[in-house]
Each structure stands twice: as structure tokens, then as C-alpha cells.
Amino acid sequence: MMRNVVISVKRLKAKHWLIIVLISYILCDYFGLLLYLKQSSYDADFSYPFEGDVASLVAQLKAGDKPKQKPVYEHDYFLYKSASDACLDEDGVRYEQLRVTFLVKSAVGHKDRRDVIRRTWGFPRRFSDVPMRTVFLLGHAPDDVKLEAEVEAEAREHKDIVQGSFVDTYFNNTIKTGMGLRWAVEHCPKSRFYMFVDDDYYVSARNLLRFLRNPVNYPGYLQEDVITFDEEKLKEQIKSRHLNQVMEEEEKESETFDPIHLRHLNQLVDFDLPDDVRLFTGFVFPRSRPHRHKSSKWFVDLEEYPYDFWPPYVTAGAYVLSREALLDMYFTSYYTKVTKRI
């Protein structure tokens, strides 16, 4: 009798241990511990999406040549609406030389946000002497006929909607961004800068324009408010307000110009960036980890990305690209693997 009781207790304990082990395994899997243990080292093993000379492949695409290596992403969508006239001049023939083009990532149903942006910071004639444009990047809602009809009417009225054939979901924001790059290259190639921004942001266009004059030294180079952004007018303001001041200070101290003073003078007079500059600016995450717990909105499986850290990146909510940087980003996207998409 006692022997049977001992055996029953042992069996009961074994069942309990099995349950505990099973629950522990499920929890470890759910919270990503198992995936964390299987990750590859970013510092030691990073190679993504493949080994190859991407720069030379991008140069081939820019030149219109057939690349030696097949792209891994073909931008396999088409544009329902292209806002193809958005960046043309008043004659509707040539592309206008724009200072900034805003590409606003917007959900299909966010017409109220788009209307606010059109009336405020996205208004294209906000500054009379600064040519700007604003377009809105949308996916589509195939199951909502009424909403699609509303977008159609909105596009006819404002002519600023760029809509792709992919479903408008959170995980397709990567495709939406790629669509913005493609649209800029095909339909707005003469803008000096491009700002990608979400539709729940407010952008101070004035501060942005000031920043783009001298990104490295902003805001220190601004001694006084600037009312106009016309290049010739700005140069005259700078000459009259700052150049004489620097010269007077030099005469008082009876010193000759040295490189530091000359550099300061150049910052005041030659203030604009070169046309071929590669500028990519925004809030930088230098080192962050992929989310491996399956409850996370940003969960990433090892098959999608196997490394323990992301490369340094600029957050997607708001960032600015110069024309050359945008061209590089667009053509490089052909050799960048797209992860989640729906």
C-alpha cells in the first residue's frame, strides 16, 4: 500500500514538472527569449541583404544600364494616382526648381489630417519667395468602396495624392516610403530637398528652411531673424549686418585674417550647401535591438532579420534628404530586402 502511494506521488511530481517545463517553454517562446539566444552577432557577422558592391550597382542603375546583379526588390506595385503635375511650373511644361518637397505618409482615412496640413505648414505658397510642394503618400483600402471614392474626389480636387496599389497597413509603410522615393525621382526630380514626414507631425517650415541653410552649424549661425529665403536678398542682408561687423572687429584689434576668421566669414557669406551634397538628417538611433517578443507591434522574426542589433538608422517619422541622397536611397532600395508586408 505504502509503495503504491510513493509511486503515485512520484508520478504526480513528474506531471507537475512536465507542466512547469511546458509552460516555461511557451513563455520563453512568447517573450522571445529563445529567439534572443539564436540571434547572430551584428558586430561579428553582419552581412545584409547580401555580399556585394552595392555602390557600383547603384551607379549602373543611375546611368540607365542593366545592373550586373539582379535586384532583390523591384518596386512591384503601380500607382493608382500619381500627382504627376504637382511639381511642374506654372506653364505645366517643365519641372520647377523647388526648395523643399514634403512627402507626407498618410493613412487612407486621414483626410482631416491632410486638410489641416494643406491649410497650415504644407501650404505651398507659405513663403512667397520659397517654392515648395506637398504631396500625400497613400496605400489603398480594397474593402472600403466608399472610402476609395472619397480619396478619388480628394485627388481630383487637390491633385496632391500619390496612391499605390498596396494595402494601406502599418507594415506596408516601408513600401509607402519606397513609393515616395520613386515618385520623387519620376515626377519631382528638381527639388533641392525632400522631407518625409508622418501626417500626425507639425513641421515648422520656417525653422526647416533655416536649418537647411547650414545644417552643421544650426542654430548657432543664426544671429538675427531672417524674413526672406531668397539667396540674393540673404547675401545682401549678411553683407550689411555681419561682414562689416567682422571687418570692424578686425581693424580694432589690428589683426590680420587667420583661417578661423576666414572660415567664420565663409559661413556667413557662402551659407548654402553645394548642389551635389548628400544630406540625410533626422533623429538617429545609433544602436537598438530588434523586438523579439511576439506580443510586440514591432516583432521581427529571425528569418526576416537574424542579427542582435539594427544598423544605425534615422527614425521614419520625420527626416530630410537632399536630391543626391534621395537618388542614392531610391536606387539602393532595389538591393534592400523588404521585411514585413501585407
What are these model-derived regions, one by one?
Residues M1-I342:
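Secretory-pathway lumenal glyco-enzymes, predominantly type II signal-anchor Golgi glycosyltransferases
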